[in-house]
Amino acid sequence: MIYDFRLTGTLTGTWGKRIAAVCLVLTAAIALPAQDGRTLPDAVKFKTLVNFDGTNGLNPQAPLVQGADGSLYGTAYSIYTGSGGNIFKMTPEGSLTVLYNFCAQPNCADGSIPNGLVLGRDGSLYGTTEVGGVSTNPGCGGCGTFFKISHSGKLTTIYNFCALANCTDGAYPNGLVLGADGNFYGTSEGGGSTGGYGTIFRITPGGVLTTLYSFCAETNCTDGGVPLDSPIQATDGNLYGTTQLSGANGGGTIFKLTPEGMLATLYSFCAQPNCTDGSFPQQGPLVQGANGNFYGTTRGGGANPNP
């Protein structure tokens, strides 16, 4: 554990009145070396480019991706009109255009609640929606989609999750990562062949989905369950990620998956007394540092419990 957060002070405000902003760190500041946890130098400047007010989107939660045209593309979780979120395009100067509003089709057949975007090898943007889409399985009125969108805003739904009996292909997908082979890799929070604890999958740009692993395949779910974000492909070619729940100690896991689909649990959280090593890994993919190690956060545990 590198740092243990502790909550101090009083939190105020309501979720319903949150206004999110896209911020830009000046290019000159991005090139500065890491400060090893110290205060950022005065040369680092932040500039607010867009204030989301509900009419242009609300609660953007995923990173932006830069297209070949130099524009920045992103998603907003939901919008004021009650729709299922949107995809937007923004110039580096801050001029924002909404490209697509989800739930534009009856019963949200085009998907709802988008995750982050990924730039494919063909220059198109790909992504997933957490819910919505067309499902033929009872009990799942739309378990998410995999889509492609052009830079002009033409959206094509490529795959509808829960297309197989009992949702063995997964349900409620998270974000994606582009693999070295040109395919996309991701996780789902539900579905799978072992009780609905989520999956790791590979999907081609054309929509051929292969389930690589279904969580809770081991007794007492010691392999983890319910991943909340995409894995990353490390320099060794394997996929690494986290699960929010289960594991040998019940606090979630860190896993490695080979391209052949062999999963190894690298760490089970809450292994130390009072979960001082952390518990319940936070939403957000791991980061591999230049030293080859992986970095991430948990939303529970630690040596400094909240007062």
Regions found by a protein language model. Give the residues of each.
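Extracellular beta-propeller repeat domains
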Residues: I2-P307
